[in-house]
């Protein structure tokens, strides 16, 4: 399941992108959980690293997409960002915040699906498996590829990484 954030201030355009996501899901069999935001500040302020892909408009009222991406990158360097914009001059700036790509409005379904496929391939390549380990009342997330061996000692497990 791909966790996707859709950040677009124009409700009509946000609906169109949502339809594209649903169409892509039906055609590819890929499942999405989509969270919609109507401005950059809604996603950036208090951002939690829970998304695989963010589709984000650049020109928005309160916080533009570039500023939102800068704030998001402070917390999450892994999330894939694809900018959707009317202005091609933002493309170079988009790469400065680690955007995977950008799409010019009006977005065709073909262009959208190509960018989304590329993003999903990147998500699949970085997919890892984690164990959640509770130690001394605190939950820890441990990447299974970092474990060398596990030792059992008097009903306790010791993970060697």
Task: State what each model feature region is.
Residues 1-5:
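Non-catalytic signal-transmission and effector/linker regions of two-component phosphorelay proteins
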Residues 7-8, 37-39, 54:
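Conserved sequence signature across two-component system core domains
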Residues 8-9, 86:
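Acidic di-acidic motifs
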Residues 10-35, 74:
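Two-component/phosphorelay signaling modules centered on CheY-like receiver
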Residues 32, 58-60, 135:
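Short, flexible loop segments at the rims of nucleotide/cofactor-binding pockets, characterized by
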Residues 36-42, 65:
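Helix N-cap/capping motif at the beta->alpha junctions
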Residues 45, 51-125:
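CheY-like receiver
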Residues 114-161:
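Conserved binding/recognition cores within well-folded domains
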